[in-house]
Amino acid sequence: MKRTQILDALNASAPCDDIRICGWVRTRRDAKGFSFLELNDGSCLTNIQVIVDEETDAYRSVGEATTGASVDIRGQLVESPGKGQKWEVRAATMTLLGKADPETFPLQKKRHSDEYLRTIAHLRPRTNKFGAAFRIRAEASYAVHSFFRENGFFNVHTPILTGSDCEGAGEMFRVTTLPAVGASAPAEGSVFDGDFFGKECSLTVSGQLEAEIMAQSLGKVYTFGPTFRAENSNTPRHAAEFWMVEPEMAFADLEDDMQLAEDMVKYVISHVMKHCAADLDLFCKFVDKELSARLENILAHPFARVSYTEAIEILKASGRKFEYPAEWGADLQTEHERYLAEEHFKKPVAVYDYPKEIKAFYMRLNDDGKTVAAMDLLVPRIGELVGGSQREERLDVLEARIKELGQNPDDYWWYLELRKFGTAPHAGFGMGFERLLMLLTGIGNIRDVIPFPRTPRHLEF
């Protein structure tokens, strides 16, 4: 008999004389002649109550249906006389699929700390909080794809293994088949002659450059996949492996870029609020009581826009004593970003036209020769959510910028060649998907919105 998901059982329009459900026991309560099971299969936040009568075959195995055990139940879906749930299941048969020793099962009825749950990442999705977080993650991922499909973008798959550093920061994970290439290896490229690719290979930090290639043919594209940064940063906002959403648009400028970022963020938030109401409600009640109002505020108003120069002036005039003083030419720190989004504008704000010295070589040089057509979208509680720019389409300017930043133009011959044959204005951005999830849920640590976090000194699971 086909299994019915608990979500579908709870949303049934009529009783059912024969239903099959499977799931994990959350709790069991024994009474005279009956046992009451709370069962969850991950399809939704709400458990379904199962009544096991001592007169039925199901009662024979009820003693082993301890917290964490998995069971297969057949019975009747009937109206529940209790409050808070329309339906319950009266079990006729129950098969114990997997035992869970109550003495050693790591998830007990008490509320566990996030720090403890990170040590058992293989079991934490069974908790209410993390089950909800990962259902929201799945729905938000679907929303990203839906948004771009509805707006005429093509999804392209960019390489995970790369021979180039998009950001020019050098903080990349090396990939090699050589037995002893490490930090002490010679810097010359010849050391990699015997390697698999015959050259140095790393995990990608961004799919942007390859997405630009595809946009120069397909017009509007996006990539959505894992990226890797070998930054030794143990902060709540950084992970060594995370997912990036990276659209690229031909025949577009910085204005188009900022508008696309705003539209996408609002679309995903609206979609998740519509399709994950119960899961979001958990976070609104127990994680961040201001979450609902914050998300509604984001949807209700146009995002603010301010130049980097104006942002520095706002920070200086704020009277706030920042740990890092706001000075023109210095990058904005998280404390600056959050002040602008949370306290000054009280909503998301796009900061644009940054000094060229603090931005990457591919960002279009503005006419003033001092700034580039870059933008960062800052949001409350998070800081930077999106970073993007109009890309430099002029060959001579791009070559000069690469050399100015001490990089080798030969490494980007293919990227430069795009500017020789039908070059066109284009723009794009990158959004850290986990940071969007932090915004959606109110969760304060990136380790808790990705199933298996990769951070310095942590590579379990």
Curated annotation (Swiss-Prot):
Keyword Transmembrane helix: no
Annotated localization: Cytoplasm
A GO CC annotation given for this chain: cytoplasm
PROSITE patterns from the UniProt entry: AA_TRNA_LIGASE_II
GO biological process, one term: asparaginyl-tRNA aminoacylation
Enzyme class: ligase
EC number annotated for this UniProt entry: 6.1.1.22
CDD domains referenced in this protein's UniProt entry, alphabetically: AsxRS_core, EcAsnRS_like_N
Keywords for the protein's UniProt record, in alphabetical order: Aminoacyl-tRNA synthetase, ATP-binding, Cytoplasm, Ligase, Nucleotide-binding, Protein biosynthesis
Catalysed conversion reaction: tRNA(Asn) + L-asparagine + ATP = L-asparaginyl-tRNA(Asn) + AMP + diphosphate + H(+)
InterPro entries documented for this protein: Aa-tRNA-synt_II (IPR004364), aa-tRNA-synth_II (IPR006195), aa-tRNA-synth_II/BPL/LPL (IPR045864), Asn-tRNA-ligase (IPR004522), Asp/Asn-tRNA-synth_IIb (IPR002312), NA-bd_OB-fold (IPR012340), NA-bd_OB_tRNA (IPR004365)
Family: Belongs to the class-II aminoacyl-tRNA synthetase family.
Quaternary state and interactors: Homodimer.
Designated name of the protein: Asparagine--tRNA ligase
Organism, as annotated: Oleidesulfovibrio alaskensis (strain ATCC BAA-1058 / DSM 17464 / G20) (Desulfovibrio alaskensis)
Source species taxonomy: Bacteria, Pseudomonadati, Thermodesulfobacteriota, Desulfovibrionia, Desulfovibrionales
Protein's gene: asnS
